[in-house]
């Protein structure tokens, strides 16, 4: 997934956006460090999609209510044999990030880190040195 043997030249951190409360969402402001590396609309679309997925994970509905009831009735042992709605959506997030890295970010010398690996505090984007510059071409 990581660009092969390219040294890290920096990291960018996309902070959480608390303007709408404490729900998990990240700022869509385009960081200057990514200028000339990735299209602004593509970056914003990635962050918006992640925000929508996290909103879906936190949404309370019939399934979440049923999971809670089953958990209470089984002394939470039900979670040994089934995934919660939240866990299923987190898997979707991981898959989406992996796809974005493969299709969009890695070819540009960038790597998105799953926010769950940073405690849902930030989206970390690692910037690798431009291969063309490092190989002397």
Swiss-Prot record:
Keyword set, alphabetical order: Golgi apparatus, Lipoprotein, Membrane, Palmitate
Annotated Gene Ontology cellular component terms: extracellular exosome; extracellular region; Golgi membrane; Golgi stack; palmitoyltransferase complex; tertiary granule lumen
Membrane topology, record value: Lipid-anchor
Pfam families in UniProt: Erf4 (PF10256)
Descriptive protein name: Golgin subfamily A member 7
PANTHER family noted in UniProt: GOLGI AUTOANTIGEN, GOLGIN SUBFAMILY A, 7, GOLGIN SUBFAMILY A MEMBER 7
Function: May be involved in protein transport from Golgi to cell surface. The ZDHHC9-GOLGA7 complex is a palmitoyltransferase specific for HRAS and NRAS.
Family: Belongs to the ERF4 family.
Top-level division of the source organism's lineage: Eukaryota
Subcellular compartments: Golgi apparatus membrane
Record's subunit section: Interacts with GOLGA3. Interacts with ZDHHC9.
Tissue: Expressed in all tissues except colon and thymus.
Sites of S-palmitoyl cysteine lipidation: 69, 72
GO biological process, one term: protein targeting to membrane
The keyword Membrane is annotated on this UniProt entry: yes
Entries under InterPro entries matching the protein: Golgin_A_7/ERF4, Ras_palmitoyltransferase
Post-translational changes noted in the entry: Palmitoylated on Cys-69 and Cys-72; which is required for Golgi localization and interaction with GOLGA3.
Keyword Ribosomal protein (UniProt): no
Main location as per UniProt: Golgi
